[in-house]
Regions:
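Extended non-globular C-terminal regions
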Residues: 218-366
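Charge-dense polyanion-binding interfaces
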Residues: 187-233, 326
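N-terminal nucleotide-binding beta1-loop-alpha1 segment
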Residues: 1-17
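Catalytic core and acceptor-binding pocket of nucleotide-sugar-dependent glycosyltransferases
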Residues: 141-203, 318-323
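A short, N-terminal amphipathic alpha-helix
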Residues: 27-43
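Conserved donor-nucleotide/metal-binding helix-loop-beta segment in metal-dependent transferases, i.e.
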Residues: 97-124
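Acidic donor-binding segment of Leloir-type glycosyltransferases
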Residues: 44-65
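Short phosphate-binding loop-to-helix
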Residues: 58-89, 98, 325
Length: 366
């Protein structure tokens, strides 16, 4: 049985634009909080793997592993594990599970010690704990993206145990929409909360959606990579009706977007009726809409830059260089209902966090 797992955090692929730096700094803040929480949970060794030559981490038990070599996720992870002679690993991308506390890491380590691989999402993983044996590492080496890691280990015949789908296990920091959710709800570790407190983004649009979650007469539209667990959560935990368009789950892990194979019913409808009618129709279907723009971009085979995607999430169309995304974002802002734009995390942990915050405010009479 594996013992003494090490927390291995990957922090790289950072951008140069202000909006990218804002998200990347938040990811690093969350990763530092995670390392501290893991240590409190009995995991006394952490390794930050990065391509940032100037990254310095002043936390007890944390080492920094820097490489400027061409990046391949699986080979890099397996190399770190072998070179540092790790017995077991809790892998997390920087910004993953920003709500994890000491007890959460303790639970992961306990399950791992029983001989099973542990993940927050078998289909698209952000956190994976695994024994550092050769069968596992052979599977790890073949993985190109971290969100395919749990599935690759399962397909190699190794037992995988999935954590319960909760806000804590599903919240992730991938884009500015996640920062807006966390800024509104006030959740996260101390470094992340301090970082969010210094940001200018306006959460008013997100706040407008909160009363809908607790109102039986309201309806929200959710469109994008929504898994069955998220759908079940929304049906079970919200008072409002939910109109769901679930499309292209696993699009990134399977490489369908990159290959130009993603297809979206909403995308076909948008192409048929145009932007104005598209958003008019949304207002006839619900009182607010949550849209995973990455699915629409994949459908249209548009490789929008990370900067442009983030600017769209923030509702800043004038700075977006990609024409479709600029026009779509501008139309979303002018729509007759609140339209929240984001990526996969908004469709899962983000919606969960907003709903739970809405109920907390409702119970307080706010």
């Amino acid at each position: 049985m594996p013992e003494s797992p090490a927390l291995v955090v990957f922090y790289g692929g950072t951008g140069d634009s202000p909006v990218e730096r804002t998200v990347d700094d938040a990811r690093l803040s969350a990763a530092l909080d995670a390392a501290e929480a893991a240590r409190e949970g009995g995991i006394d060794r952490a390794i930050f793997v990065t391509d940032q030559s100037d990254l310095a981490v002043d936390l007890a038990g944390v080492a920094v592993d820097i490489s400027a070599e061409p990046f391949h996720f699986g080979r890099r992870l397996a190399d770190v594990v072998r070179r540092r002679q790790l017995d077991a690993v809790i892998y997390a991308g920087a910004g993953s599970v920003p709500l994890f506390a000491a007890d959460d890491f303790r639970e992961v380590a306990s399950r791992l010690a029983r001989g099973v691989i542990v993940t927050n999402n078998s289909f698209s993983s952000d956190l994976v704990a695994f024994p550092a044996n050769e069968p596992a590492l052979a599977a790890v080496e073949r993985v190109e993206r971290d969100n395919a890691l749990a599935r690759a280990l399962s397909e190699a015949g190794l037992p995988v145990d999935e954590l319960a789908r909760t806000v804590t296990t599903q919240m992730d920091i991938d884009s500015p929409s996640d920062l807006l959710v966390l800024g509104l709800t006030g959740e996260g570790g101390p470094r992340l909360r301090e970082h969010l407190a210094g940001l200018p983004p306006d959460t008013a649009l997100y706040a407008r959606t909160l009363p809908l979650f607790t109102d039986r007469a309201s309806q929200i539209v959710v469109a994008g990579r929504v898994g069955s667990h998220s759908w079940a959560y929304l049906e079970r935990e919200t008072a409002c009706r939910v109109r769901l368009f679930a499309e292209e789950r696993g699009m990134e892990a399977d490489g369908r977007a990159e290959a130009g194979a993603a297809r979206s019913l909403l995308g076909f409808f948008l192409e048929s009726v145009g932007l104005d009618r598209f958003f008019e129709t949304l207002s006839e279907l619900g009182d607010a809409a949550f849209i995973d723009t990455r699915v629409l971009l994949g459908h249209k085979r548009i490789a929008a830059s990370r900067q442009d995607r983030f600017l769209s999430d923030l509702g800043e169309p004038d700075a977006i260089s990609e024409p479709f995304l600029r026009d779509f974002t501008r139309s979303a802002l002018a729509a007759p209902l609140p339209v929240l734009l984001g990526g996969h995390s908004l469709m899962s942990g983000g919606l969960m966090a907003l709903n739970e915050h809405a109920w907390a405010l409702s119970e307080q009479g706010a």
